[in-house]
Every structure is written in structure tokens, then in C-alpha cells.
Amino acid sequence: MRPIPLDLGVAAIVLRDSKILLVQEAQGPHEGQWGLPKGYVNPGELPASAVIRELHEECGIKGTVTGICGVRECVRNELARIFIAYHVQTSNQPLAIDVDEISEARFASADELEQFNWISPAMHDLAKSGLLNDSPLAKIDYSTTQSYPYLVHIAKEEIPI
């Protein structure tokens, strides 16, 4: 394989009591709009590690990736842009938002999702899917058998061929 330039982002799908964690952007082009806790992957960082870091930076909570809920992919200005939404399991830790990035955070039910001013239709769809569906791709961590971070995400059910 050959490396290519890539814009790689991640989002956390965190559920509590049948509600999903949403954040309102405090600044930038999406100021005042709602979405999932999200951010960019740093060089040399696994996307699954980045989502845990971003969740802690933005909302002050820690968690564990349990699987992938969805992926958004597009090409803009000749640059591939990939965005991975991970299910993240957390305990009932209190939220402690980073007010420089996030103006508000709250848990919302499926019935409430339509009332938000979303960052994008894709973000809305990822949140809705994450709230209504379990992770279709489960995580297997092979890092302990390799000399580097190594995760595989596979379907939970056997897929007939």
C-alpha cells in the first residue's frame, strides 16, 4: 500500500439511559450547531485512540471503544475525507466540557434529535443510527500479539457468502 494525503476524523457515540451524548460547537464555522463529540486523528495515532482522547478533551469523560457505528467518506478539493463514528462505553461520569470548544453538552432521546441545528445531515444520521443500533462492527484488539497498535473491526454475525 502507498500512503495518500487524508483528512481523518472521529466521533464518539456515547449512550446513557437510551439517550445519546450531543455537543454544541462553541466556535468556528459550526458555532452554535450540534453534533457528536468529535475531532481529528493525530499523526501516529489510531483513530480508536483519537476518539477516546477527543471525548475526554471535550467532555471530561473516559471510555472504551466497543465498535464502529458508521463511516462517512467524501472527496473535497481532491482530498479524501474519512470520518469514523465509534460506539464508546463509559461509566456514569459527570460531564466537564471544554468551554473553549463546546458551549453545551447534553444527552438527547431519539424523539429530540429533530429539534437540533445539526452540523450536517451526515452527523444527524450517524447520531440517529448510533442511538437506535448497536455497533454493527465489533472491535478485536490484536495489539498484544503485534509490535504496534493493531485493531480489526468485523461483523458480529457470520455473513453468508
Language-model regions: role of each:
Residues D7-G9, E31, R81:
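Short coil/loop residues immediately preceding or within conserved phosphate-binding loops
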Residues K62-G70:
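A short coil-to-beta-strand element that immediately follows conserved catalytic motifs
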Residues G9-V10, L46, S103:
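Short loop/turn microsegments at loop-to-beta-strand junctions
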Residues E101-I161:
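Nudix hydrolase/Nudix homology domain
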Residues A12, I68, Y86-V88:
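A structural signal for short, well-ordered beta-strand segments
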Residues M1-I20:
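Conserved N-terminal beta-strand and adjoining loop/helix that marks the start
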Residues E73-L95, R106, A110-E112, I119, ...:
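Active-site-adjacent beta-strand/loop module that shapes the phosphate/pyrophosphate-binding cleft
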Residues K19-E57, V152-I161:
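Conserved Nudix-box catalytic region and its N-terminal flanking loop in Nudix hydrolases
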